[in-house]
């Protein structure tokens, strides 16, 4: 065999070896799988070439076996991890479902309590309405009573309207008072008849004299008790007494008010 043929065989073997190493680098990220693959030397022509090919095939087979083993191992771990996570998640879901069911039960209980508390006060008005309806059923003369009440109300309103109209057209009432006066003389020698004439001689707007009589005091002395009616806005009792005692001081000692009544 020539030197050129031997170099061609070596170059061909090295090319296969480089392709396998590059595939290993790309797939395993730098991990060495073909650690047992050693470049062979062809010392005997065809024998060296066949030995190198056999070793290359064995290395490729070992690489595939190692790759399948690694993939199966990593996939099993991932599946186990996923199963554990799935179990944990399922447990959490069950716990949440139990919590939601408990909350729904509590909410339903609260709603039932509120419904009963609201229905209790409403029962009283309903009972009152039913009672009133029952009374209406047994009140045979209820409609007549209502008509009578309406008629009475109309009569009262008419009378009030008439009174208001009459009061508007008529002047207001005059405030008057009835006054009883005791007119006392100086002594028993005073002419009581003349004293009465002097008292009655007083004339004022709103003053009307009434009846009079003589009442004994003692020691033969008598006093004159006389009634008068005055209009409160026109006549003052104090002014009247002052006028009697001032104008007739020769006959009159004093004047006292016995009674004072509004008319």
From Swiss-Prot:
An example Gene Ontology biological process: translational elongation
Keyword DNA-binding: no
InterPro entries hit by this protein: eEF-1beta-like_sf, EF-1_beta_acid_region_euk, EF1B_bsu/dsu, EF1B_bsu/dsu_GNE, Transl_elong_EF1B/ribsomal_bS6, Transl_elong_EF1B_B/D_CS
GO cellular component term, pick one: cytosol
GO molecular function per UniProt: guanyl-nucleotide exchange factor activity; translation elongation factor activity
Protein purpose: EF-1-beta and EF-1-delta stimulate the exchange of GDP bound to EF-1-alpha to GTP.
Family per similarity comment: Belongs to the EF-1-beta/EF-1-delta family.
Subunit structure comment from the entry: EF-1 is composed of 4 subunits: alpha, beta, delta, and gamma.
Protein name: Probable elongation factor 1-beta/1-delta 2
Source organism per UniProt: Caenorhabditis elegans
Lineage: Eukaryota, Metazoa, Ecdysozoa, Nematoda, Chromadorea
Name of the encoding gene: eef-1B.2
């Amino acid at each position: 065999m020539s030197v050129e043929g031997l170099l061609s065989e070596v170059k061909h073997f090295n090319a296969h070896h480089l392709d396998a190493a590059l595939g290993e680098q790309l797939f395993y990220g730098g991990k060495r799988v073909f650690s047992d693959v050693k470049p062979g030397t062809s010392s005997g022509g065809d024998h060296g070439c066949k030995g190198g090919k056999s070793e290359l095939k064995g290395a490729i087979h070992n690489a595939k076996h190692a790759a399948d083993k690694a993939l199966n191992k990593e996939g099993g771990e991932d599946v186990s991890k996923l199963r554990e996570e799935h179990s944990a998640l399922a447990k959490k879901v069950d716990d949440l479902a139990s919590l939601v069911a408990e909350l729904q039960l509590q909410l339903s209980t609260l709603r039932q309590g509120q419904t009963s508390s609201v229905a209790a006060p409403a029962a009283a008005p309903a009972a009152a309405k039913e009672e009133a309806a029952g009374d209406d059923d047994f009140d045979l003369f209820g409609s007549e009573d209502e008509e009578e009440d309406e008629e009475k109300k109309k009569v009262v309103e008419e009378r009030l309207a008439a009174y208001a109209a009459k009061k508007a057209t008529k002047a207001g009432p005059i405030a008057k008072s009835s006054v009883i006066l005791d007119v006392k003389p100086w002594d028993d020698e005073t002419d009581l008849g003349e004293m009465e004439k002097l008292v009655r001689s007083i004339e004022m707007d709103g003053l009307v004299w009434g009846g009079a009589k003589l009442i004994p005091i003692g020691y033969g002395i008598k006093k004159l008790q006389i009634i008068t009616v005055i209009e409160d806005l026109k006549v003052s009792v104090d002014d009247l007494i002052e006028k009697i005692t001032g104008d007739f001081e020769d006959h009159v000692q004093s004047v006292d008010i016995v009674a004072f009544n509004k008319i």
